[in-house]
């Protein structure tokens, strides 16, 4: 009977740990998405100002 209790406690701990890991992973995903959105907003702003300079700079950097 004591083995059943230990096993049940380990399962509960494992489930709690998994939930914490998933929560942490989800927060990292939200952070990554936010960073990507910021980068895309910056690119949109540059393209709105002067698309030709942006493309020229991008092509030169990519070609080196």
UniProtKB/Swiss-Prot annotation:
One of its GO terms (molecular function) is protein tag activity. The N-terminal unstructured half of Pup provides a signal required to initiate unfolding and degradation by the proteasome but is not needed for pupylation, while the C-terminal helical half of Pup interacts with ARC to target proteins to the proteasome. Pathway: Protein degradation; proteasomal Pup-dependent pathway. It holds the Pfam family Pup. Protein modifier that is covalently attached to lysine residues of substrate proteins, thereby targeting them for proteasomal degradation. The tagging system is termed pupylation. The keyword Repressor does not apply. GO terms for biological process: modification-dependent protein catabolic process; proteasomal protein catabolic process; protein pupylation. Residues 20-58 are annotated as: ARC ATPase binding. It comes from Rothia mucilaginosa (strain DY-18) (Stomatococcus mucilaginosus). Keywords: Isopeptide bond, Ubl conjugation pathway. This is Prokaryotic ubiquitin-like protein Pup. InterPro entries: Ubiquitin-like_Pup. The keyword Membrane does not apply. Strongly interacts with the proteasome-associated ATPase ARC through a hydrophobic interface; the interacting region of Pup lies in its C-terminal half. There is one Pup binding site per ARC hexamer ring. There is a cross-link at residue 64 (Isoglutamyl lysine isopeptide (Glu-Lys) (interchain with K-? in acceptor proteins)). It comes from the Bacteria. Belongs to the prokaryotic ubiquitin-like protein family.
């Amino acid at each position: 009977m004591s083995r059943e209790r230990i096993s049940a406690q380990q399962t509960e701990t494992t489930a709690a740990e998994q939930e914490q890991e998933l929560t942490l992973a989800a927060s990292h995903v939200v952070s990554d998405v936010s960073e990507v959105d910021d980068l895309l907003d910056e690119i949109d702003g540059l393209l709105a100002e002067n698309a030709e300079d942006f493309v020229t700079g991008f092509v030169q950097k990519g070609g080196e």
